[in-house]
Amino acid sequence: MSLVLYGHPLASFCHKVLIALYENGTPFENRIVDLMDETSSADLFRFWPVGKMPVLRDEALDSTIPETSIIIEYLDRHYPGPIRLLPDDIDRALRVRLWDRFFDLYVQAPLQKIVTDTLRPEGRKDPHGVEEARGTLATAYGMIEQQLGGNQWITGDSFTMADCAAAPALFYAETLVPFGDDQPKLRAYYERLLGQPSFARVLKEALPYFKFYPYSRQLPERIRNEMPSE
């Protein structure tokens, strides 16, 4: 198969690319990487020595594509499907890129900081950094609430790359800093994302791995009820 995605079912940034692939039914091989296993991770580091997932390998064009937004734009150009995840109109495309960056930088980054800090041993934790990260999430929620207005999706009526970024970011962030009662549009948007077939498929595939998430008890009840019993 021409396209091979190196990633992991628990990783939120991998979810973002999987949503894009599933939205358009793009054929690809989903290769799960265990970073703790040298054999499993060998190809990832060979193609992208930084070792960050996901990485897309296009064997047909002998191309290695890292970074989620670049991967999705690459797919949109070289393997277009019925759903254009990046509009042709320049101004609309800029809005999509802006909100794609917003979710990566101001939702994903702070949630990653909080989760990473949880895994640190005592004496190496960063309570000040965690407090800042929680504050960033709270600010981001308010901005998303305002941006949504009457939109179905984050930049309008069309599902785009920005919504691919939003889905996993909000899914994990909500387990750390729940949405406020004064954010009904954000909550409704979150529910629409959960109901999107592409994201529902991603979450279903991640069910066996959610037990490794440090905040698994804060996952939505509907997800916890579907997780395999140990």
Enumerate the predicted regions with their spans:
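Short, flexible loop/turn segments with low-complexity composition
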Residues: D88, R201-Y209
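Acidic/histidine-enriched, glycine/proline-rich intrinsically disordered or flexible terminal extensions
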Residues: A206-E230
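Positions that flank functional sites
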Residues: L35-M36, F159, P208-Y209
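Compositionally biased, intrinsically disordered low-complexity segments enriched
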Residues: V17, L56, S198-F199, K211
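GST-like fold's C-terminal all-alpha helical module
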Residues: F103-S198, V202
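GST-like domain detector, emphasizing the conserved glutathione-binding G-site
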Residues: M1-E131, P220, E230
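Acidic/proline-rich low-complexity IDRs
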Residues: S2-V4, T175, G195, E226
